[in-house]
């Protein structure tokens, strides 16, 4: 991997985890910032959550503010309590790319207490042509993206939590992933890929009509309903 972590932020995270372990409350998820280290770029994009999450204290989902599209929790910003991952029986598909989305999604209903440390910890290197998030590579591996997408649909449908903020965040994340899957299938621009897009939508509609209708009125729906060649080029 070309990724790395910032030493000073790492020390702060270890110190915070140590203090939290000694405290009276159990923290299920520690969140920090990560930085996109793009090859050839002079300016770096920092994924931070200062306007969305309380800082330097334990909080619950009810205090999580709306995250705009493009801002969501990725594996690079999340440290789960190990026992929680065992409790939720998280099992990632083997020999499959893009499972980091499942790691950042499936355990969330089990997370009750969160903590946000505003440090730029993880450095996520992007921009290489052979990376899994490169468009051409994603199109080549689209079946794996679809598999992960369907598992996220299942996880959202099976989520028993009644917490509105949690469900809203999970839907927003699912919306983004479904939009990405559909855009990649359209960009592939083959009969087979367009058929796979239809099959993905049919899967969602069959599993849960309410989720399907909600997606049709979200970012996914707006992108998929762009008129004429504009929509197809997306």
Predicted regions, residues:
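Amphipathic alpha-helical repeat scaffolds of TPR domains
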Residues: 171-184
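Nucleotide-sugar donor-binding/catalytic module of glycosyltransferases
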Residues: 1-144, 161
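Secondary-structure edge/capping motif, primarily at the C-terminal ends of alpha-helices
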Residues: 156-160, 184-189
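C-terminal, non-catalytic tails of nucleotide-sugar-dependent glycosyltransferases
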Residues: 144-169, 209-211
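Amphipathic, well-ordered alpha-helical segments in soluble domains
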Residues: 120, 148-152, 177
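Membrane-interface aromatic/basic loop that binds lipid-linked glycans or pyrophosphate carriers
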Residues: 187-234
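Short, charged, amphipathic alpha-helical segments
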Residues: 166-172, 194-198
């Amino acid at each position: 991997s070309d990724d790395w972590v910032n030493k000073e932020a790492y020390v702060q995270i270890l110190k915070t985890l140590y203090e939290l372990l000694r405290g009276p409350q159990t923290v299920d998820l520690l969140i920090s910032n990560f930085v996109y280290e793009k090859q050839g770029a002079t300016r770096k994009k920092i994924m931070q959550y200062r306007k969305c999450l309380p800082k330097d204290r334990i909080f619950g989902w009810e205090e999580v503010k709306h995250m705009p599209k493009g801002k969501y929790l990725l594996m690079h910003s999340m440290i789960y309590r190990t026992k929680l991952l065992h409790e939720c029986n998280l099992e990632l598909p083997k020999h499959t790319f893009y499972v980091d989305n499942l790691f950042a999604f499936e355990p969330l209903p089990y997370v009750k207490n969160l903590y946000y440390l505003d440090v730029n910890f993880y450095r996520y290197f992007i921009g290489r042509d052979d990376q899994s998030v490169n468009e051409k590579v994603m199109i080549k591996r689209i079946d794996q993206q679809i598999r992960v997408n369907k598992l996220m649909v299942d996880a959202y449908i099976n989520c028993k939590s009644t917490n509105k903020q949690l469900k809203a965040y999970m839907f927003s994340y699912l919306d983004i992933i479904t939009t990405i899957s559909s855009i990649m299938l359209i960009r592939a621009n083959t009969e087979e890929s367009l058929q796979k897009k239809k099959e993905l939508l049919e899967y969602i509609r069959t599993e849960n009509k309410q989720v399907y209708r909600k997606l049709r009125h979200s970012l996914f729906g707006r992108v998929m309903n762009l008129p004429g060649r504009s929509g197809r080029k997306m």
